[in-house]
Amino acid sequence: MKKVAVIGTGVIGNGWITRFLANGCEVVAHDPAPGAKERTIQAIENAWESVEQLGLKEGASKDSLTFVDSIEEAVKDADLIQESVPERYELKHGVLKEIDRFAHSNTIIGSSTSGIKPTDLQIGLNHPERLVVAHPFNPVYLLPLVEIVGGEATTKEITNRASVYYESLQMKPMVIEKEIEGFVADRLMEALWREALHLVNDGIATTEEVDKAITYGAGLRWAQMGPFMTFHLAGGNAGMRHMLEQFGPALKLPWTKLEAPELTDELKERVIQGCETHANDRSVEELEKKRNEFLVKLIDLVEDYWP
């Protein structure tokens, strides 16, 4: 991948541009908004020290960016196209149809949408099979996760190609096999966000207290492992199996405003087997040791940067 087109240069688009440049790509950008080019140049300048600390790839340069006046000019020779216009369906769909019209038929188009299903974005495209969701996380130039989601017209070959593309950008692509609004990470964050709003609205906690609960509690663990492995370790030597036996009934308690799914035997086994596979033959004791080493370093960082 040598040449990348970025359509839309807001916060997300500029984050993509910075990541592409830091990985040695030539970037062609288009955004009709007044002052877009100047804002992009400033955004790159602000982020460059951070990407330098992560490590630049050979050929990385802030100067490998060109702004053009049309979508046609931006996408005509691109190896990858990243659409990052505002999150309005009519706008995104219209822009994607124009991209599809002018881009080479085998060029992958990645949409940065945070919630629209790719099948809905593929409607009316001449080559709908090459459009995938490639949803990043802010700041795009630092956070490695990118969710890749295909629509009904997308082939496995396309999602595999997209995954390879984004992995070459020092990212951690996660291919989501079944499309759903909001995908995976944002749905998890949305659940926490809604509960946080309930706690504040009901006068139970202030916004600062909610943030403190995450910053000095679960957030530290989540920086290394997600909820399933966190609870796997909480189950002691028996792991998730013991965790579900002991605490599974608590899902029926009215602790959140969200209704929990029925904890069926099938769901239990799926969760248990998933955690045991993820543990990769490492004992809970081994995992705890690694977690603790990580947390000691992370807590020091939190104290240094977030007093």
From Swiss-Prot:
This is L-carnitine dehydrogenase. Catalyzes the NAD(+)-dependent oxidation of L-carnitine to 3-dehydrocarnitine. One of its GO terms (molecular function) is carnitine 3-dehydrogenase activity. Homodimer. Disulfide bonds: none annotated. Keywords: Cytoplasm, NAD, Oxidoreductase. It is found in: Cytoplasm. The keyword Transmembrane helix does not apply. One of its GO terms (biological process) is carnitine metabolic process. NAD(+) binds at residues 8-13. PANTHER family: 3-HYDROXYACYL-COA DEHYDROGENASE FAMILY PROTEIN, 3-HYDROXYBUTYRYL-COA DEHYDROGENASE. It comes from the Bacteria. It catalyses: carnitine + NAD(+) = 3-dehydrocarnitine + NADH + H(+). Pathway: Amine and polyamine metabolism; carnitine metabolism.
